[in-house]
Regions:
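Secretory-pathway lumenal glyco-enzymes, predominantly type II signal-anchor Golgi glycosyltransferases
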Residues: 1-387
Length: 387
């Protein structure tokens, strides 16, 4: 008590009281100003380090495809990058400029060819590395559970308890006919729960050189921000990265029959569905407007159509994405490889990339041609420049 009385000496009190009053008045004023119009000030998602990742992997799978999920967990999900190559960003990443109308000037055929050539040379060069810190990747296997029998549900729940990487979609019946709905619900759940920079949508029969994909994305992200700091940007640049097709005929029959596509007599440009990458802003747009978007049969065509009007999307056509309905000729520079079995995935992980070609039936038709995309031409003429 004596010590307390000492510090509350008369002269000290005279100095403290005005300061205390000023502090309380300042707090009151701050609260009044902050609550003037709370509706117009969205709070946003509270940062949660456990749910914050650089790259999300949305792997579309069926309940019964446990063998494929196991192969993925045992192969490419282990290819987490530990270092980043300094030369990658300088030699292999191209950030396109905006024109005076605010449209992105996409890569010419010549630029695409040069970037591929640079990459093939880069693969053979000794690498100069720096440490890569805080690089987080979150894989999620999306499975529709609506209408599933109890034994299937029990198996999925057990798998989730063991691995913790299942995105359970209770409201989605898992079938090809519902694939677009499945993608929409997946993006809504991911956008609501996670903070991330990019999302890769993948089929469960697609092998990914995840270390290369992640390194490319991080280099792209860093270079994009460097360019935007140096130049007066005309707004944020979003990324839509994959192997684009621009002259596809609208399907009138079969599993891919499209009854509701009336925008044109051909599909607009879209990245093939074996695997593509979207930046966070595009995922959020799709998730936010999911209830208003047209539910086209093929999800890759749907995504391309939903994103068609936007001027600030970098549509990055990349021949390293072998993501069509049938594999192209095997190349060491391919980064995403579609239509691979669990055995093929283990072969690739062991360094044998092309064993799938031994399993191709004879007389089954030729391999699709690999092309650069000419963005200066109409979509019907886009894809005639072969690699």
């Amino acid at each position: 008590m004596a010590l307390t009385r000492y510090y509350l000496h008369k002269r000290t009190c005279i100095g403290i009281v005005p300061l205390l009053c000023a502090f309380l008045c300042g707090m009151l004023l701050t609260l009044l100003v902050a609550n003037t119009n709370p509706v117009c000030t969205p709070v946003g998602r509270v940062y949660d380090s456990e749910n914050s990742f650089f790259l999300m992997l949305l792997i579309v799978t069926a309940p019964e495809n446990f063998e494929r999920r196991t192969a993925i967990r045992e192969t490419y999900l282990n290819l987490r990058p530990r270092t980043i190559n300094e030369s990658y960003q300088e030699e292999l990443i191209h950030i396109p400029p905006f024109n005076d109308r605010g449209q992105i000037i996409l890569e010419t055929v010549e630029t695409q060819r040069q970037l591929l050539s640079n990459y093939r040379v880069w693969l053979q060069k000794p690498k100069k590395n720096i440490k890569l810190l805080n690089f987080k990747i979150k894989p999620l296997f999306a499975i529709g559970l609506h209408g599933q029998p109890k034994n299937i549900r029990r198996a999925i729940y057990d798998e989730q308890r063991v691995f913790g990487d299942i995105l359970e979609l209770e409201e989605v019946q898992d079938s090809y006919a519902n694939l677009t709905s499945k993608i929409l619900h997946s993006m809504q759940k991911i956008d609501a729960k996670y903070d991330f920079k990019y999302l890769a949508k993948l089929d469960d029969d697609t092998y990914v050189k995840l270390d290369v994909l992640a390194e490319d994305l991080l280099s792209y992200y860093e270079k994009l921000h460097q360019v935007q700091r140096q130049q007066k940007s005309k707004g944020p640049m979003e990324l839509y990265w994959g192997y684009f097709r621009g002259a596809a005929t609208i399907q009138k029959q079969g599993a891919w029959q499209e009854k509701d596509y009336f925008l044109c007599d051909r599909y607009g440009p879209y990245a093939l569905g074996g695997g593509y990458v979207l930046s966070k802003g595009l995922v959020s747009f799709i998730a936010t407007h999911a209830d208003q978007l047209s539910m086209y049969k093929s999800e890759d065509i749907a995504v391309g159509t939903w994103l068609a009007p936007f001027r600030n999307i970098h549509r990055r056509h990349d021949v390293r994405f072998d993501t069509a309905w049938k594999p192209r000729a095997c190349q060491d520079y391919h980064m995403l490889l579609h239509k691979r079995t669990a055995r093929h995935m283990r072969d690739i992980y062991a360094g044998e990339m092309c064993t799938h070609e031994e399993d191709q039936p004879s007389g089954g038709g030729g391999q699709p041609k690999e092309y650069f995309y000419d963005w200066t031409l109409p979509p019907s003429m886009c894809c005639k420049t072969t690699v």
